[in-house]
Curated annotation (Swiss-Prot):
It is found in: Nucleus, Nucleolus. This is Polynucleotide 5'-hydroxyl-kinase grc3. Its main location: nucleus. The gene is grc3. Residues 1-132, 603-626 are annotated as: Disordered. Keywords: ATP-binding, Kinase, Nucleotide-binding, Nucleus, rRNA processing, Transferase. It comes from Emericella nidulans (strain FGSC A4 / ATCC 38163 / CBS 112.46 / NRRL 194 / M139) (Aspergillus nidulans). InterPro entries: Clp1/Grc3 (IPR045116), CLP1_P (IPR032319), P-loop_NTPase (IPR027417).
Amino acid sequence: MMKRKADRQTAAAAPVSAFAARKARLQQTQTQVQTVVASEKTTHTDVAAEPPSKRPRRSLQESQAQSTSEEDTKRTSKRSAAKTEKVQRVDSGTITRTRETRMKDSEIEVEDLEKERSSNEESEGEDAVEENAAGVVAVPAAEDGYESPADNTMTVVFPLSKIRLNKNNIVYSDEDTLCVRIQEKLSIVLIGQYDLWVKRGVVSVMGAKLHPSPRVYRVYAPSTHSLPVIKCVTGVNGAAEVEFKSCHSGITRLRDLSPLYQRLWNSGNTPADKLSLKAVGQDARRTFSVLHTSADDPLKRHLRPLHLEKQWSAAIKVLSQRAGRLQVLICGPKASGKSTFGRYLLNHLLSPAPQPELNYTNTDGVAFLDLDPGQPEFLPMGQVYLAHLRSPVFGPPFTHPSLNNEREGTIIRAHHIGATSPKEDPDHYVLAAANLMEQYRTLLATYPQCPLIINYPGWIFGLGLEVATYLIQSLGLSDVVYMSEKGPTEVVEPLSQAASLARVSLTILPSQPTEFVSRSSAQLRSMQMQSYFHMAQPAGVSHPTWLENPVSKNRPFRVRYAGENRGVHGVMTLDSQIIPDLLCESLEGALVGVVAIESPNALPIPSSNAPPANEEEATSNADDDVDMENETEHNRNATISHLTTLTISTKESLPYITSGPGTSTPLHPSSSSMLGLALIRSINPDTQTLDLVTPIPSTRLIQSLERGHALVLVRGVLDNPNWAVAEEYYAARAEERRVRRGIRGRKEAGVGEQGDESVEQRLLGLLKERIRRAKDVPFMTVVEDHGRRKQEEAAQRALWKLRKKAGIESEDEVGY
């Protein structure tokens, strides 16, 4: 009998006989797959009680190596496959079985691409698979961080809902609505987006305890994050009644603009959906699906329930008892669960049990001070802010990229950091944090029972630790929570000493990292930024909506940057100074912060430009004589006058704000504030105008101008808006797929007239030309994947990759 190549290579260490070799291999692999096959004797699926450890991501080369390994396994003879059930271990830690074992354990094998494509009946799943089977295929050597893991070869099934839908617990259902009865201590899990209404009993959702009321809560449950668990806490006659209703916010439309938004929501009906839709029809679709286990998902994604550590629950209970006196700072290493804990605590504080006997309900809301510019909760990256929340939040950050609703919450004040990490300018970061804390104290005058939650970034080592200890000692906190029991000691000891000096309680909790991350931090930032520019919330509408048009198709604001009636009074850069001759090129296509200068004190005044003492006294006396009606105009003129002394004019007449040669001093937070972000589409030197795309409400801009504020644009070092460049390409691809589906459907139905085929071919030709033009934009390259696995799965697909615009001494384009 011929030996395999792998057997020949390890012959020296192998047993003597073939029987002994087979027995040794089986004993060696038995412990490796013990957790996977423990329950195969009784069930066809492997159900795990707790989430496994975080798995490493595989690159494209590893995926190709795995596919080659699978092909070698398939070529083994039937005789050897029948004698042995060999388990071959791949580098990424996943387990690949031979053909016989995979046929017996169909629940944990990888679905074939064509089989998965045929199982998806909804357009989202179909479009996602046609575009990219893995969500976003990783391009080798990507430097911008936009890579995502390939599909795992093994999917471990997890229990999600603790109830199974049947005729006894389904109160009523139709094509849009499902009302279920949940017994106490049991729970249900859904994927998608829906409106939740508690009719009877009390249920808990992401830390919030929702009591019966006419209020409806919007819940977003995508596959990128652990799914919310709706659990019955107390009920009427031992059960609670909850109604779930489909909602059409438009956020699913973003799948046509970016592959990052594909395979996020429900796709096709699950077994529980088919049961509840039996009376309506199997063709009906809701915007949510009920899942009993992760195996019910038609797309076979890594779905996990959102569990809460017992120590977390105890800490939240203790902190919430402080009510309005609570001022807590949450810190810890990266990926330790700070955002999840803060969201749970926020929702718990916003949903206390009503006390009618005391005639008291929480109407003061909760203040949320977000000091993490890399992964903020309610604004895009690069900002720190103070938000005032009135309602619990059920969804990841890209489902609420801004707050413009008085009922749900508003942004009190924000400052532009211009980077994803505060280490770029820690002094400016500390000043911004102190100013936001002053705004919170001002808020207490109106809402005296408003607690405060401070979210500190994962910058907890080195200089970041010094900043954290300074904030603990200076902000007047009541509690500090550190999210790691593993230390390290060099971090815990300084935090403990700072808390002791400030007489602040320090609580150390275990970290709870996210399992099976399907999007990287850079991808989540890109998704939140894209959602920010596409979200709209008209006046009088309780929930936001998302628009599907690419930002390049939106009509921009045309603003003058020179002349008497200019809308922008200056442009400044952070972190590093840009040569004036290159300022125009660096601004086109860049993300900038729209900052309002409230007084001249925000500007750095060089000593050479300081006015003489007698002039200051005359100005002071003149200020006393100014009427209140003219005070706003006087303040505006003074600010513009100081801006003039700091600006230099470029060859395009752009007002470039500098505080000296080679220096770039940010605006002082006490006299400036951030209004929002804008995307500069183009600069026209002939008309001296800027074309800006921004979601900032026009009412907010008008209000700032009426107060006499001067608007400036601040360019930082944020991630390049590659998503904006690629939106037209993906929109064209999505339109082509829709047209092809329509043509295929008409042919199958036998509907059509003579001459329709020529019209269809002309239409497809126009769409192909649109795709070609969108693909040929600057800094965008289509990379063809000629991997063996991709050739077998489908025809060669075009994968795009964006290249950053390289500046002087830049290596961003090296290797492409």
